[in-house]
Amino acid sequence: MPKLKTRRAAAKRFRVTGSGKFMRRRAFHNHLLDHKSPKRKRYLGTMAVVDERDHDRVSHMLPYAG
């Protein structure tokens, strides 16, 4: 059977944890930051776990991740 291709766009956006979960960046942290509080901007700078309902979709895009 041939090797499966990784979707390169997904490979740049997701990271795998040791337990097999996927991490992602948070939205709303690119521009228009003047009116957002420092606390909110710190929070938006952290990584988030991909929801369990989206886990299968991400894992199909990244067949060799974990």
Swiss-Prot record:
Keyword Transmembrane: no
InterPro entries: Ribosomal_bL35, Ribosomal_bL35-like, Ribosomal_bL35_CS, Ribosomal_bL35_sf
GO molecular function: structural constituent of ribosome
GO terms under cellular component: cytosolic large ribosomal subunit
Cited Pfam families: Ribosomal_L35p (PF01632)
TM regions (residue ranges): none
Ribosomal protein found in the keyword field: yes
GO biological process entries: translation
Family stated for the protein in its record: Belongs to the bacterial ribosomal protein bL35 family.
Database matches in HAMAP family: Ribosomal_bL35
PANTHER family: 54S RIBOSOMAL PROTEIN BL35M, LARGE RIBOSOMAL SUBUNIT PROTEIN BL35M
Protein's name in the database: Large ribosomal subunit protein bL35
Organism per entry: Synechococcus sp. (strain RCC307)
